[in-house]
């Protein structure tokens, strides 16, 4: 470990963590495709926090745009069941760090440790739907809901995280995005046309996994994935087949043997530890035709959610998220300038001054305000000094 002014440099799993001196006691807690997450102690508040390093955010325009999108979403979406952005800073090595409240575990780890009791299944489902109602009202689709993106603390408070794949509600969408087990069939069938209903399919898969303790559709590849979905739901109806854009996909679906659906109360007959209403809600989420799939707002009014449903405490987002940047094809340096601006804006809006442990240094602010921001074309080598 070494210290350089306001920043301390530590190597974790071969990765340099260069964070402000406000955060101490780093310990790795998770690794993803785009970042490493460490727990830390916030010396200012005394709270445990999660510090996420975004790996090489300016190495390509695609990664820069993805990071910018996640930052914009975290700033805009403020809800009890969504992870909130407590701090963000840019290190001297030009890595970006997001700081959030540390949650004790995630649903994936919880499910692999022990079976869930029915009251926890019900409460977790309610909180996921409550968060989704808010996300969808902002004009946002999460696109990557899965147990590892559902964070839970010791009080069973639940927060949805990882908005890096989130996308505008748009009839033309891009291909494979979510972990296969939780991927809606319309993503596999059409690749381009889907909406908020893909998230409800994912919730159905998560609910089934909480009930049975194992993934409902553990496909080995997308062909196998679709095949085992049809084992439960039967062959897709003609109106769904008519939406398939790809000729290859259409030929594949038409080549499958006809299958009749299995009634959900028969498929889950052994799951006597949960209420029949849970299976009924599950059946309303796992429907081939997304237009017939239940919405998050409607799911909150389902009888299974009755013990927790409170229409006065299930807010929507007051303003739609601004997606105007999303179709932009910009060079890395432009995304970098936009990112600097968002970081500075975050600290100004939050009212974070020097007395409160400001993470953006005066040197950074001066750098941000320079005309053109003469940033390096390539990220600097990350070497521990």
Swiss-Prot record:
Keywords from the named record: Activator, ATP-binding, Cytoplasm, Kinase, Nucleotide-binding, Nucleus, Phosphoprotein, Serine/threonine-protein kinase, Transcription, Transcription regulation, Transferase
Top-level division of the source organism's lineage: Eukaryota
The free-text domain note is: The TXY motif contains the threonine and tyrosine residues whose phosphorylation activates the MAP kinases.
Record PTM text: Dually phosphorylated on Thr-174 and Tyr-176, which activates the enzyme.
Protein name per its UniProtKB record: Mitogen-activated protein kinase HOG1
Where, per UniProt, does this protein localize? Cytoplasm; Nucleus
Q: Of which family is this protein a member?
A: Belongs to the protein kinase superfamily. Ser/Thr protein kinase family. MAP kinase subfamily. HOG1 sub-subfamily.
TXY: where is this motif? 174-176
Q: Which GO terms describe its molecular function?
A: ATP binding; calmodulin binding; chromatin binding; MAP kinase activity; protein serine kinase activity; RNA polymerase II CTD heptapeptide repeat kinase activity
Which GO BP terms sit in this record?
cellular hyperosmotic response; cellular response to oxidative stress; filamentous growth; negative regulation of cytoplasmic translational initiation in response to stress; negative regulation of exit from mitosis; negative regulation of G2/M transition of mitotic cell cycle; negative regulation of induction of conjugation with cellular fusion; osmosensory signaling pathway
Purpose: Proline-directed serine/threonine-protein kinase involved in a signal transduction pathway that is activated by changes in the osmolarity of the extracellular environment. Controls osmotic regulation of transcription of target genes.
Q: Which InterPro entries match?
A: Kinase-like_dom_sf (IPR011009), MAP_kinase (IPR050117), MAP_kinase_CS (IPR003527), Prot_kinase_dom (IPR000719), Protein_kinase_ATP_BS (IPR017441), Ser/Thr_kinase_AS (IPR008271)
Query: Residues in the active site?
Result: 144 (proton acceptor)
Phosphotyrosine, modified sites: 176
Q: Which cofactor does it need?
A: Mg(2+)
